[in-house]
UniProtKB/Swiss-Prot annotation:
Name of the protein described by the UniProt record: Photosystem II reaction center protein J
This protein's UniProt keywords: Chloroplast, Membrane, Photosynthesis, Photosystem II, Plastid, Reaction center, Thylakoid, Transmembrane, Transmembrane helix
A single BP term in Gene Ontology: photosynthesis
Localisation: Plastid, Chloroplast thylakoid membrane
Record's keyword annotation contains Membrane: yes
TM annotation in the entry: 8-28
GO cellular component, one term: chloroplast thylakoid membrane
SUPFAM superfamilies, sorted: Photosystem II reaction center protein J, PsbJ
Subunit structure: PSII is composed of 1 copy each of membrane proteins PsbA, PsbB, PsbC, PsbD, PsbE, PsbF, PsbH, PsbI, PsbJ, PsbK, PsbL, PsbM, PsbT, PsbX, PsbY, PsbZ, Psb30/Ycf12, at least 3 peripheral proteins of the oxygen-evolving complex and a large number of cofactors. It forms dimeric complexes.
Domain of life of the native organism: Eukaryota
Gene that encodes the chain: psbJ
InterPro entries for this protein: PSII_PsbJ, PSII_PsbJ_sf
Gene source species: Piper cenocladum
HAMAP family reported in the protein's UniProt record: PSII_PsbJ
Length: 40
């Protein structure tokens, strides 16, 4: 019995989490490269 109804699928959570993590890392490295993240 797959209870995916009314519940967010696990693959969707993993995909969104991966995109957010990659986005944050990209923003962090971009900020460090452009000098904005040097104060962090």
């Amino acid at each position: 019995m797959a209870d995916t109804t009314g519940r967010i699928p696990l693959w969707l959570i993993g995909t969104v989490t991966g995109i957010i993590v990659i986005g944050l890392i990209g923003i962090f490295f971009y900020g460090s490269y452009s000098g904005l993240g040097s104060s962090l």
